[in-house]
């Protein structure tokens, strides 16, 4: 009998993961009910290029394409989301400035990242030499990645 319960539970779980996602009242989806979000997060990308350049960004996850954005100096782009119960939420961005570009992960399931982001808000700032993550624990920007030369 125990094997049958485990088998039925496995079938229900796999159906929940593959079910069609339907938007319900207030923006809640069926997936949110079946696989609840663990915590709410915000990711922010800031153009801190002191040369006055426009920063091009294109951010996405497996499920969401956040579109192409051109950020002027000191402008920011933010999005909110809930990490899923499977801890598989993952966002990355392509960024481009006049003489450099990069593909960079901006959110993934990692306790060190969570600590640096203060368990709620990851702030990435593009500067002339690279991309920095605001470390809320130490109160300073930390260089995460340097620009690759070219387009």
Swiss-Prot record:
GO terms under cellular component: extracellular region
GO biological process: pollen-pistil interaction; rejection of self pollen
Main location: secreted
Keywords of the record: Secreted, Self-incompatibility, Signal
Cleaved signal peptide residues: 1-18
Record-linked Pfam families: Self-incomp_S1 (PF05938)
Tissue: Restricted to floral tissues.
UniProt superkingdom: Eukaryota
Subcellular location: Secreted
Family: Belongs to the plant self-incompatibility (S1) protein family.
Protein name: S-protein homolog 1
Organism in which the protein naturally occurs: Arabidopsis thaliana (Mouse-ear cress)
Phylogenetic classification of the source organism: Eukaryota, Viridiplantae, Streptophyta, Embryophyta, Tracheophyta
Recorded name of the encoding gene: SPH1
């Amino acid at each position: 009998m125990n094997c049958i319960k485990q088998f039925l539970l496995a079938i229900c779980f796999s159906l929940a993961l593959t079910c069609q996602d339907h938007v319900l009242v207030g923006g809640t989806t069926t997936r949110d009910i079946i696989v609840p979000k663990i915590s709410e997060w915000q990711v922010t990308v800031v153009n801190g290029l002191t040369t006055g350049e426009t920063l091009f960004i294109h951010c996405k996850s497996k499920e969401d394409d956040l579109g192409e954005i051109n950020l002027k100096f000191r402008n920011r782009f933010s999005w909110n989301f809930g990490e899923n119960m499977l801890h598989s939420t993952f966002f990355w961005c392509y960024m481009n400035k006049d003489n450099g570009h990069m593909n960079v992960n901006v959110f993934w399931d990692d306790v060190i990242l969570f600590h640096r982001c203060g368990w709620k808000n990851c702030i990435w700032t593009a500067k002339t030499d690279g991309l920095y993550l605001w470390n809320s624990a130490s109160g300073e920007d930390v260089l995460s990645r340097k620009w690759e030369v070219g387009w």
